[in-house]
Amino acid sequence: MSRAFYLNLAVDNLKKNARTIIPYILTSVLTTMMLYMVVSLANNPNLNEMLGAMTLTQMLGFGVVIIEIFAFIFLFYTYSFLIKRRQKEFALFSILGMEKKHLARVLFYETAITLFVSLALGIGLGILFDKAMFLIIAKMIGANIILGFYFSFIGMRQCILVIGLIYVLIYFYSMIRIHISSPIELLHSDHMGEKEPKAKWFLSIIGILCLGIGYYLSVTTKNPLTAFYFFFVAVVLVIIGTYLLFTSISVTFLKLMKKNKNYYYKTNHFISVSGMMYRMKQNAVGLANICILSTMVLVMLSTTLSMWSSIDRVVDSQYPRSVMGNGYGDASNIDFDEMSEELIRMGIVPKNLIAYKRLDYAGYLKNGTLITDYSNEGMNAVNEIQEFYCLPLKDIQDYENMKSSLKPNEIYVYSNAETIKEKTLSLFGKEYVVKKQLDHLKMDESNPNVTEHYYIIVNSEKTLEKMQEDQANVYGDNASAIRAYYSFDCDANEREVIKKLGQNENINDFIWTSKSDQKQGLIELYAGILFIGIFLSFLFIMATILIMYYKQITEGYEDKDRFEIMQKVGLEQQDVKKAIHSQVLTVFFMPLLVAGLHVCFAYPMIEKLLHLLFVSDSWLYIRTTMFCFVAFALVYIVIYVLTSKVYYGIVKRNA
């Protein structure tokens, strides 16, 4: 047989299977397009020249890796559905005399055509929309728009290599499936596995434990740094638990309902319970995938939108003044009054001045004693680690409106954690009397509250220096130094002020930065996270659409047979339709409900992770999450309604 014969046969096969092949090709095209755009943006020289694009470029590079992994998993998963639906077709070819090597050639041309269309359209659309994405990013980070056309050879090469490799592996996978199966097995493969599912108690218990432990970690973890460590553990546990929930726990629960004879042997209950058992067995993995993808969309959109919405609030709280300077080592010995006089001589008039010296260190309090060596304490100690900020009273007296005084052995204490019960604190071997525990500290409003922390207010700078010496005796070379902080507002241009300060020999040991620069850096970071979050959310929604579409096709062909069987045993067509359609609704909306449950339990941990990125407005995150869930639920319903038309078309045609 000639090459043209195999090519024509491959084209005919693609046309005959257009209902399932076209959505797959469309998904492959969109995945290729998105991969090209992200790679192109990450390597775009015009983007790299923009102010504040370094972090954004790094975020895009991270997005490239995620998209490549997703493309491999998702294209492989959806192709497994296609190859399963075509088993009978391959069996007929074999019965008609076509050998497996001939089938291999036909599949080769089918795969090659699909790959060519995916690359050609995907890269073409990527080039078309690449500039639009570039302009959106430039607008997000407030950069100047650079006009002109840019083609990414790296993006095209990456798409050809990655998508090409995926299709090569898909081709070999299909060859293995055909090689190990006989024509008879292929012919009847779509009718296999119709035995009643068994209750899997062991896997059900494992699933419940995985979900329970994952939820427990999220709810009970208090320290944001610990939350970051446990987040990935909790995610893995919940993913495992989700798969077991749909594959084992649901079937086990339905089995228990079946054992209740008073409940089970009623017409409505009998049909719904028995039907749901088979549906859960056949659709479990797909439903779990939809649930996990839905959860990922909700989490990504809610967190990234919360971060982007809080930029101004974060900047104002973290950087309360226009210009900020930090001095370490010898620079920390500077006299603040002399510094203010120097600034005035330079023509810079500092307003709303905040200036203090501070000693920072970490540890945790145990019965009023600072524990500094926790290397042998394990994860429990990590959970307890607290930050300590020690300041002299005179530096913050005016800012905090404190009128009282302290003796050398007395301290004021403020904590965002818990009330100190002890009357004295032992810090680096020296006892300090807690004169008062403060209820509020103004300067803590600009602290990101990443961990539990204490402000220790001592009577003088001399006492602070003595505490630093005591700390050095404990930590040695790892001891922290006293830091001088000097910040102010001014009428002049911030960047010009920073430039002048850096050129002054008397104060050039300070590291100066401006509020506008810090805001630009934050915009750069959050813009990258938001862009990748929206990009990946679109990918996951696209995957959800395709899975639901294929599930509707599967349900349609299976329910066609169920309609016939139930009508033959005497059930009215209206009752059969009502029972089956209610089962379909339950099956397809269960992932959305479980995803909502996952998001609710994920809230405590995600809230703490947002603290690491300085987002501490919990109510903003709650509102954003609720909005995202409602919006996604509406999209989910629209997807279901649109894909269900395929289902009803199959059932009505065959009922």
Regions found by a protein language model. Give the residues of each.
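Basic-flanked hydrophobic alpha-helices used for secretion and membrane insertion
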Residues: 314-542
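N-terminal Sec/SRP start-transfer signal
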Residues: 1-32, 196-201, 210, 245-294, ...
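Short cytosolic juxtamembrane segments of multi-pass membrane proteins
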Residues: 3-5, 180-194, 557-558, 648-655
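Alpha-helical membrane-protein architecture signal
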Residues: 3, 7, 11, 105, ...
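Hydrophobic alpha-helical segments
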Residues: 113-257
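Hydrophobic alpha-helical transmembrane segments of multi-pass inner-membrane transport and secretion
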Residues: 19-46, 55-91, 111-125, 205-206, ...
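Short helix-loop junctions at transmembrane helix boundaries
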Residues: 40-53, 123-155, 212-229, 591-654
